Amino acid sequence: INSWILLQKDIVLRAFLKKNMKLPELFEEKMRRLLGEDFSEYEKHLDDPAYYGIRVNTLKISVEDFLKICPFHVTKVPWTDNGFYVDREEKPSKHPYYHAGLYYIQEPSAMTPASYLPVEPGDRVLDLCGAPGGKSTELGAKLRGEGLLVSNDVSISRTKALIRNIEMFGIRNDM
């Protein structure tokens, strides 16, 4: 019954947002120009549900070992070695594995930049837009404790989350 109620609330919310929420006019005009005939397909997908994901912290556990103990039903994100889709309803932020730093909660498309950067142990890496820590924690895991990771952000309030996530992940070669 709870799932049905959540689904009904989700449907009502989507209908309300579709009717009442509009893209900023200048943004919509620019996207129409850029996408041309594909704009209607783009617009149709704006109402799609957002994907939710987790990324395994390979500094603390291998992907294989994590999958053996994973308390959620997960599906591989195809463009990463350690990213998985997870149902938001499973509440991965409430699980002790999250608080132990075994995984990071991250929208799957946000996993892309750090997963494609060819960072290796011993490299020196600078993340200028580091908060809240998604890229930095993945880059730190790739460094495997060797080299240097400098993570920063212009927002002091956001750096608190960055520091917390770096510490939770066990990254020791960060400043």
Model-derived regions: residue spans:
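S-adenosylmethionine
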Residues: 2-175
